Amino acid sequence: MMTLKPGYLTLPQLRQIAREHVALQLDPASHAAIDACAQAVADIAAKGEPAYGINTGFGRLASTHIPHDQLELLQRNLVLSHAVGVGEPMSRPVVRLLIALKLSSLGRGHSGIRREVMEALITLYNADVLPVIPVKGSVGASGDLAPLAHMSATLLGVGEVFAKGERMPATEGLALVGLKPLTLQAKEGLALLNGTQASTALALYNMFAIEDLYRTALVSGALSVDAAMGSVKPFDARIHELRGHQGQIDAAGAYRSLLQGSGINVSHADCDKVQDPYSLRCQPQVMGACLDQMRHAANVLLLEANAVSDNPLIFPDTGEVLSGGNFHAEPVAFAADNLALAAAEIGALAERRIALLIDATLSGLPPFLVRDGGVNSGFMIAHVTAAALASENKTLAHPASVDSLPTSANQEDHVSMATFAARKLGDIAENTANILSIELLAAAQGVDLRAPHKTSPSLQKVMDAVRKDVAHYELDHYFAPDIAAVTRLVQDGTIAKLSPLSFASEQ
């Protein structure tokens, strides 16, 4: 059981929520603030004075006053009319994150929602009865309205849920946990709908995957250094301290650790090669820049995970209702776009190392990493696949946040496109995982071909993990299953765990 303390979620907690179903309970210390804010909204509604989101229309219809006897209908209509998402459902881990983030935001006591509504959401979450939320339909301002409307509709008994391995009507899902459809009171529908939780959940989920890919790329890159008989001198700490970028310093340290004790490296210590190609030599500089961007994105997304991104905001101590723009997901969009650049570059650099390894002139290995070339093509077309994926990533990495289309009759005239920025990270991550699996296979093949010289003790663990599932490439054979097998090792974190570097989300 995880105690959710609104405004104090940590990256390790968020990673745990993404990776497994852990039961949640609301920190009792948050109850007073939630109840006070709900009462403040009830008092405002009772007075009948115009207050946006409580007794007015929405967006361009904000100047329309709604009679007191229609306030519940207003909230129901808001939820149903905004549930317009399209496309495939969000994955269950993303929905878990989305709900946890929404609970944290509501729990800070500035949204005006009753605790019983939050507890109903927690009951569904804990029973693993999760809303079916289409992944497309949000522009990231005013918040993630469509996705959150689908989440909210479940509480009304509308829409669908995933439960017990099945997709079923929301009414059946509610019945499974002993709940009846709720009637939302003043402001509650808007409190549930308004916020950046969908884009932030998508960005966090994909960021955790990219963190694992980063650690994997350190490992595969180090293995490629040994396979190509590259030098370890470019990883000397003195070089990187003179430049001063922390990511570069940390990446170089990881390469030194991984390559420490390599017999292959010792075997060519006195060779006449002066400098390696950039894809080997400049790994700390490139991967360090990626690391700095990823750490910054993690800080931004953690802030957003703990933020109140509702509108309007209620301040119970003064009774004020303040309209602002915390729903605008520009910080999330920028963070996701920066993660996209980093993930694409990780894959691009790995593709270049694969190209180096299969080129006999550069690597000194047999052409395409196979003996008896000609009758055997070896890794020739595996590299083509890596090139195709790296190229695709370059298009996917185009920033979504540079685009904006006005909506709601120009009331919402600038939007963030954060949800698309976060969503396409998943495609980039999948491509990069496959590129890294091809590099791991190529580098392992190269290390095998350096026998009797051996790689380092740290990298031998990588060799063992790869060779447990995929044998040395002797002759041409049906190659796709080999790539798929190593991709599974990449995506389940098996290879990442062999990296000496870790992220804040893992601590």
Swiss-Prot record:
CDD domains: PAL-HAL. One of its GO terms (cellular component) is cytoplasm. Its main location: cytoplasm. InterPro entries: Aromatic_Lyase, Fumarase/histidase_N, HutH, L-Aspartase-like, Phe/His_NH3-lyase_AS. SUPFAM superfamilies: L-aspartase-like. The keyword Cytoplasm applies. Pathway: Amino-acid degradation; L-histidine degradation into L-glutamate; N-formimidoyl-L-glutamate from L-histidine: step 1/3. Keywords: Cytoplasm, Histidine metabolism, Lyase. There is a cross-link at residues 141-143 (5-imidazolinone (Ala-Gly)). Its EC number is 4.3.1.3. The keyword Cytoplasm applies. It catalyses: L-histidine = trans-urocanate + NH4(+). It is found in: Cytoplasm. Pfam families: Lyase_aromatic. It comes from Paraburkholderia phytofirmans (strain DSM 17436 / LMG 22146 / PsJN). GO terms for molecular function: histidine ammonia-lyase activity. This is Histidine ammonia-lyase. Belongs to the PAL/histidase family. It is an enzyme of class 4 (lyase). GO terms for biological process: L-histidine catabolic process to glutamate and formamide; L-histidine catabolic process to glutamate and formate. Contains an active site 4-methylidene-imidazol-5-one (MIO), which is formed autocatalytically by cyclization and dehydration of residues Ala-Ser-Gly. The modification 2,3-didehydroalanine (Ser) is found at residue 142. It comes from the Bacteria.
